[in-house]
Amino acid sequence: MAKPLSITSSLPTFSVTWRAYFEMTKPKVVALMLLTVLVGMCLAVPHAVPVQPLLAGMLGIAMMAGSAAALNHLIDRRIDGLMARTYNRPLPKGRISATRALIFAASLGSLGFIVLYSLVNPLTAWLTFASLIGYALVYTAYLKRATSQNIVIGGLAGAMPPLLGWTAVTNEFHGHALLLVIIIFTWTPPHFWALAIHRRAEYAKVDIPMLPVTHGVEFTKTCILLYTVLLAIACLLPVLVGMCGPVYFVCSSLLSTGFIYKAWQLKYRDHDGSAMQVFRFSIYHLMLLFMALLLDHYLWN
């Protein structure tokens, strides 16, 4: 006689499945994005952020960002299976079907939109929806495969989070929030191009026209260096308009100098692993830069 299926025997499968769904939301990327959302919220008000827009805003934006990431997994499942960096993702490995991934992404995005629309404000809900469409459809489904400037153009969607945080609290646009968008928009190309140099052969294999594939590695190194200089200028804009004080100025200057130096090393002192060093440094650069914005806001202002 067959033994009845116990509840405990189904738990491992349940755990593995939900880990796969969680992986599809790109939690590390979303965590860094939420830091920029939080900074946008905090800089929008002189004192403490109201509890409801803080909690509901972070939750709704996180859910819609996770939805966009899941759609990215779904759309890229074929090329992900051919690349060493991504072949072990849930969809290429068959841990989740394409249909279930679509249902998950649609459900998560819809719930996030409802949270933002009903508990925060319609402006933030629609802006977050526009960012989702920009990343998941405009960038992933079209630009990524259409042009070597995919990261430059598509980077606008990924630069929106500080603005989303700002509007979640104030329900309006502000020039200061747009300065934060400009910083992330300028940061995005050197960040991704460094990774693209390291993974150039893989992108070429799947016909993704990343800049190192279409224009060569040396040209891309030059672009990275030039963009880090442009980023350093963009990072000074909050100081020039009186948005930030000396705490941010010092931190920003040090971080920008470090990023430019790493890019210079990549261009003129390249060695195995240099591109990934630039890539990793760029992550710390953005994280520490926005923490400096937060620190300056409460210590100086």
Swiss-Prot record:
InterPro entries (UniProt xref): Protohaem_IX_farnesylTrfase, UbiA_prenyltransferase, UbiA_prenylTrfase_CS, UbiA_sf
Keywords from the named record: Cell inner membrane, Cell membrane, Heme biosynthesis, Membrane, Transferase, Transmembrane, Transmembrane helix
Pathway named in the protein's UniProt entry: Porphyrin-containing compound metabolism; heme O biosynthesis; heme O from protoheme: step 1/1
Pfam families given in the database record: UbiA
Places the protein is found: Cell inner membrane
Class of this enzyme: transferase
GO BP, sorted A to Z: heme O biosynthetic process
Membrane topology listed for this record: Multi-pass membrane protein
E.C. designation(s): 2.5.1.141
GO cellular component: plasma membrane
GO MF, any single term: protoheme IX farnesyltransferase activity
Catalyzed chemical reaction(s): heme b + (2E,6E)-farnesyl diphosphate + H2O = Fe(II)-heme o + diphosphate
Membrane-crossing segments per the record: 29-49, 51-71, 101-121, 123-143, 150-170, 177-197, 223-243, 244-264, 275-295
Family to which this protein belongs: Belongs to the UbiA prenyltransferase family. Protoheme IX farnesyltransferase subfamily.
General function of this protein: Converts heme B (protoheme IX) to heme O by substitution of the vinyl group on carbon 2 of heme B porphyrin ring with a hydroxyethyl farnesyl side group.
Additional facts recorded: Carbon 2 of the heme B porphyrin ring is defined according to the Fischer nomenclature.
Name of the protein: Protoheme IX farnesyltransferase 1
Organism of origin: Shewanella baltica (strain OS185)
